[in-house]
Design a protein with these regions (language model features):
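Structural signal for beta-propeller blades
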Residues: 42-45, 84-86, 134-136
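Short loop/turn segments immediately following the C-termini of beta-strands
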Residues: 1, 39, 81, 91, ...
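Conserved beta-propeller blade signature
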Residues: 33-35, 75-78, 125-127
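Gly/Pro-rich loop segments of beta-rich domains
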Residues: 2-23, 50-64, 92-116, 142-151
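Residue-level detector of Asp-centered blade-edge/turn motifs that repeat once per structural unit
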Residues: 27-31, 70-73, 120-123
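Conserved positions at the start
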Residues: 22, 65-67, 73, 83, ...
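Hydrophobic/aromatic beta-strand positions that recur at structurally equivalent sites within the blades
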Residues: 1-2, 27, 44-48, 89, ...
Length: 151
C-alpha cells in the first residue's frame, strides 16, 4: 500500500526555506510542473516535476497571492489579498488583466474584501470566495461588477 514518509518536492523543511507560507498549488499538465502561491515571498513560482529541481522559476513577483486556478486555455487566475482583486495571466505575462475586484477593499459589487478561493468554469466565469464580506461572488467574463451567488 502507501508510503508512510512524504517527499519534499518544492521548498524545504521549515521557516527560512525557499518557499515561505505557500497557500495554494496546482499542476500544469502541459509542462508537468507545480505552480505555487508563495505567499510570504510575494510571488508565484513554477517547479518542474520532471527533475530534481532545487529552485523554482518566478512567474509573477510582488503579489500577495492567496489562491490560484487555471482554465482550459491555460490562463492563470490569481487572487491578491492585498489589492483585493483577481487577475488573469497568460504564462509569461507579468502584469495580467483584472477580472474581479480592483476597486479597492470594500463591499460594493465591484469590490472584494480578502478574496481567497477561486474557481473558473469553461466560459471563463470566475467564482470568488470573498472572505471578509462573507459571500461568494460570480464575475462573468468582461464584467465590471460581480453578482452575489451565496452569502
Amino acid at each position: 500500500m502507501g508510503d508512510t514518509n512524504g517527499q519534499v518536492v518544492a521548498g524545504g523543511n521549515g521557516y527560512g526555506s525557499r518557499l515561505d507560507r505557500p497557500t495554494d498549488v496546482l499542476i500544469d499538465k502541459e509542462t508537468d510542473s507545480l505552480i505555487i502561491c508563495d505567499w510570504n515571498n510575494r510571488r508565484v513560482v513554477r517547479w518542474s516535476r520532471r527533475s530534481d529541481t532545487t529552485q523554482g522559476e518566478i512567474l509573477i513577483n510582488n503579489i500577495k497571492c492567496s489562491r490560484l486556478a487555471m482554465d482550459d486555455q491555460r490562463y492563470l487566475y490569481i487572487s491578491d489579498i492585498e489589492k483585493h482583486e483577481v487577475k488573469r495571466y497568460q504564462i509569461g505575462d507579468k502584469n495580467g488583466t483584472l477580472v474581479a475586484g480592483g476597486n479597492g477593499q470594500g463591499a460594493s459589487l465591484n469590490q472584494l474584501n480578502f478574496p481567497t478561493y477561486i474557481f473558473v468554469d469553461q466560459q471563463q466565469t470566475i467564482y470568488v470566495s470573498d472572505r471578509d464580506n462573507h459571500r461568494v461572488m460570480k464575475w462573468n467574463k468582461g464584467a465590471k461588477e460581480g453578482i452575489v451567488v451565496a452569502g
